[in-house]
Amino acid sequence: MPRFVDAKVEHLWLAGLLSWQATHPDLPKIEPFISDDFNEATVVAWMEGEKPDVVLANHGPVLTWMRRNGWRVPDDVSFLHLNWIPEKGEISGLNQQPEKVGAAAVELLAEQINQNRRGIPETPKTITLESVWNEGTTCPRRKIQG
């Protein structure tokens, strides 16, 4: 993923991957691709070097790049979008429920207004809701080989 995206999500996706790898030492590890130079050529080079079973991405063109460079999805490699929305159609991924996040943000703002709080809070709150899996066709269920 582009480095600015990793920073924007406070490295939480990377932390999740590294935590999963640390708690499953018997399974093969893969080096995540986070770069300031995130483009088709660098993604393809990473895929050729790492040979992942599945690619998790938040960057729209990655699936197109994979297919354009000869990977058959999901036959050769699966693809999962980390920020799936209905417009993504057939793609498998995580629906972060942006409408519900927006509603929670409005509730938080209403709370601050009702309590006559202004400015940046001393202790800021973060809104996190559980994502919903969208099955799609690009990431079928498979047994883990290890």
How would you label these PLM feature ranges?
Residues M1-G146:
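Bacterial carbohydrate/catabolite-sensing allosteric modules
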